């Protein structure tokens, strides 16, 4: 009995003897009626997960949403825009610093979970981009130049 339990535990852990279950078969005579042949379809197992195919070359340009939240409750709308694939520019300058930090923390987590990026353009102004959009430094310089954000000056 202890041998059976030990064999089951070793089998569960993958440590069982490979040769224990091999059986040797004797040659069998061919079927008397050789005109009948067995038809079968091979079963192909694939370990690859079938992923969602997304076109890299899309003809539509990404939409940009500019948000100047007045309360923390607007964070849900910001995250919804990001989920919809929009680039979101958030101006949190007029918020209380603690509320602004909470908003940035929440949006940062949402951006991370969507594989996007969050970058600070200026103090209190952030750009959130979805995973399929890359913001280069030239664009950040243009956005932070004088006159681009009229609400900041």
Swiss-Prot record:
Keywords: Cell cycle, Cell division, Cytoplasm, Septation. It comes from the Bacteria. It is found in: Cytoplasm. GO terms for cellular component: cytoplasm. It holds the Pfam family SepF. InterPro entries: Cell_div_SepF, Cell_div_SepF/SepF-rel, SepF-like_sf. GO terms for biological process: division septum assembly; FtsZ-dependent cytokinesis. HAMAP family: SepF (MF_01197). Belongs to the SepF family. Cell division protein that is part of the divisome complex and is recruited early to the Z-ring. Probably stimulates Z-ring formation, perhaps through the cross-linking of FtsZ protofilaments. Its function overlaps with FtsA. Homodimer. Interacts with FtsZ. This is Cell division protein SepF. It comes from Clostridium tetani (strain Massachusetts / E88). The lineage of its organism: Bacteria, Bacillati, Bacillota, Clostridia, Eubacteriales. The gene is sepF.
């Amino acid at each position: 009995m202890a041998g059976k339990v030990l064999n089951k535990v070793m089998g569960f852990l993958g440590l069982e003897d490979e040769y224990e279950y091999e059986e040797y078969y004797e040659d069998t005579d061919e079927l008397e009626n050789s005109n009948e042949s067995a038809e079968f379809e091979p079963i192909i197992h694939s370990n690859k997960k079938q992923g969602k195919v997304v076109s890299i070359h899309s003809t539509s340009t990404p939409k940009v949403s500019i948000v100047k939240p007045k309360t923390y409750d607007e964070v849900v709308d910001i995250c919804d825009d990001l989920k919809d694939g929009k680039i979101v520019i958030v101006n949190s300058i007029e918020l209380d610093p603690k509320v602004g930090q909470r908003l940035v923390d929440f949006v940062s987590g949402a951006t991370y979970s969507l594989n996007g990026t969050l970058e600070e353009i200026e103090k209190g102004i952030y750009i959130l981009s979805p995973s399929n959009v890359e913001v280069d430094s030239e664009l950040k310089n243009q956005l932070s130049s004088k006159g681009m954000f009229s609400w900041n000056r």
